[in-house]
Amino acid sequence: MAVQQNKKSPSKRGMHRSHDFLTNPPLAVEPTSGEIHLRHHVSPNGYYRGRKVLPAKGE
């Protein structure tokens, strides 16, 4: 079993965890309808990059 040789200081522990945070996903605004959606995804009303590619829910 692996056992540490020396205790890691709070500074080193913080440096080790410095990349563990979460970031918000980048959002895009659809130019035709103004709706907000995830980048590279179809907006809820069925538009992608200004073109209608899917029928919207309820159409």
Swiss-Prot record:
Range of residues in the leader sequence:
none
- Domain of life here? Bacteria
Per the record, what is one GO cellular component? Answer: large ribosomal subunit
Instruction: Recite the UniProt keywords alphabetically.
Output: Ribonucleoprotein, Ribosomal protein
Q: Name one GO molecular function term.
A: structural constituent of ribosome
Q: Where is this region: Disordered?
A: 1-59
Pfam families, alphabetized = Ribosomal_L32p (PF01783)
Q: Does the keyword Ribonucleoprotein apply?
A: yes
Q: Which regions are flagged for Basic residues bias?
A: 49-59
GO aspect biological process, one term: translation
Q: Which NCBIfam families does the record cross-reference, listed alphabetically?
A: rpmF_bact
Read off the HAMAP family from this record.
Answer: Ribosomal_bL32
Family under the similarity heading? Belongs to the bacterial ribosomal protein bL32 family.
**Name of protein:** Large ribosomal subunit protein bL32
Q: Which organism is it from?
A: Methylobacillus flagellatus (strain ATCC 51484 / DSM 6875 / VKM B-1610 / KT)
Q: Give the lineage.
A: Bacteria, Pseudomonadati, Pseudomonadota, Betaproteobacteria, Nitrosomonadales
Gene name of the record: rpmF
